[in-house]
């Protein structure tokens, strides 16, 4: 453990998933890249902007591959490692799979931070990988000006039980497993307006592994028609992507959305990130926010780090699903439903 107090958020300009390249800008960049033709065994590639790639090996096993890394979103090194790992592991769970191996991705400023920080970050990650019943099998590191850490994760899933963001069915209920608000709360932390202890509920949520699949019976798992995790593009952006991929529309009630107690207050204080604005720009033509106040709209665009899963589930089992999920995810809630395609991809109502 590090012997002196280090505030990692003060060593970077932006942190967590709020540091993502804006979605609209990224799409324009990727349009200029000529990618090779997809192999027939690829069940999911980058075309749908899903959470991970899936490569079918045989009729019983498919490979799930993803990676995620970012700059510090919290001050404590070990907690940063825990959150970075939980965030990377989440993409495998969002596809219905289970992680098996993880490799570390580390950029570290050797000239400005003590090496003990690496130990703490790696230990935090190792603890979460073990919690996911996966193996930490190595990685790669470089000396850099800014600390960055994350994981490349490989998992497995039955090809017949893959979740994607493209399978939502009209009539499904939408379930969100974690509260919103990590973007604005951690913005307050970076501005040194609060201490970690003041927003511990959100920090613990970010460090919570998204293994919702482990709390589902086989029957419940089969009733998940689509899934994605809510991260840097916010509920608005990731919800829009799911609706577009599934060629449906989502109707979501703001009053049903779980949120951290201080989130709206922090937004009112102006604790916004660049991602709040880029997410609003990204989704402005595709979502409806009629009747919502500006602070409520900010929360929809709030960039989540290691946010919850958004599940599109048969309405016949949605109540049972929520009850099962609340064994771990206490805030799991039905927040809306899937509609036939409308003019807007996502319709947010009060």
UniProtKB/Swiss-Prot annotation:
A GO CC term assigned to this protein in UniProt: cytoplasm
CDD domains for the chain: SelD (cd02195)
Keyword ATP-binding: yes
Keywords: ATP-binding, Kinase, Magnesium, Metal-binding, Nucleotide-binding, Selenium, Transferase
Enzyme class: transferase
Secretion signal, residue range per the UniProt entry: none
GO biological process per UniProt: selenocysteine biosynthetic process
EC number: 2.7.9.3
Protein family per UniProt: Belongs to the selenophosphate synthase 1 family. Class I subfamily.
Protein name: Selenide, water dikinase
């Amino acid at each position: 453990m590090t012997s002196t107090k280090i505030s990692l958020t003060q060593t970077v300009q932006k942190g967590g998933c709020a540091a993502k390249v804006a979605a609209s800008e990224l799409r324009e960049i990727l349009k200029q890249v000529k990618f090779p033709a997809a192999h027939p065994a690829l069940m999911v590639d980058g075309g749908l902007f899903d959470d991970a790639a899936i490569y079918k090996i045989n009729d019983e096993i498919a490979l799930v591959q993803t990676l995620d890394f970012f700059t510090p979103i919290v001050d404590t090194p070990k907690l940063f490692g825990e959150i970075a790992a939980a965030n990377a592991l989440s993409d495998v769970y969002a596809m219905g799979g289970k992680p098996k191996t993880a490799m570390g991705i580390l950029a570290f400023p050797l000239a400005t931070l003590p090496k003990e920080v690496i130990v703490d970050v790696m230990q935090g990650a190792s603890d979460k990988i073990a919690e996911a019943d996966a193996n930490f099998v190595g990685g790669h590191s470089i000396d850099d000006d800014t600390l960055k850490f994350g994981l490349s994760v490989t998992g497995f899933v039955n090809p017949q039980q893959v979740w994607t963001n493209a399978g939502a069915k009209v009539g499904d209920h939408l379930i969100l497993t974690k509260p919103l608000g990590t973007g604005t709360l951690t913005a307050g932390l970076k501005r040194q307006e609060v201490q970690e202890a003041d927003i511990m509920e959100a920090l613990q949520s970010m460090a919570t592994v998204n293994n919702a699949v482990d709390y589902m019976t086989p029957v419940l798992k089969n009733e998940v028609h689509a899934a994605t995790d809510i991260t840097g593009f916010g509920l608005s952006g990731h919800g829009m992507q799911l609706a577009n991929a599934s060629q449906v529309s989502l109707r979501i009630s703001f009053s049903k959305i779980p949120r951290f107690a201080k989130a709206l207050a922090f937004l009112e204080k102006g604790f916004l990130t660049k991602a709040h604005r880029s997410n609003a720009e990204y989704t402005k033509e595709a979502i409806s926010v009629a009747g919502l106040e500006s602070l409520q709209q900010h929360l929809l665009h709030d960039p989540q780090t290691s946010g919850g899963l958004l599940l599109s589930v048969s309405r016949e089992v949605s109540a049972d699903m929520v009850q099962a999920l609340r064994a771990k995810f206490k805030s799991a809630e039905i927040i809306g439903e899937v509609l036939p395609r409308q003019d807007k991809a996502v319709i947010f109502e009060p």
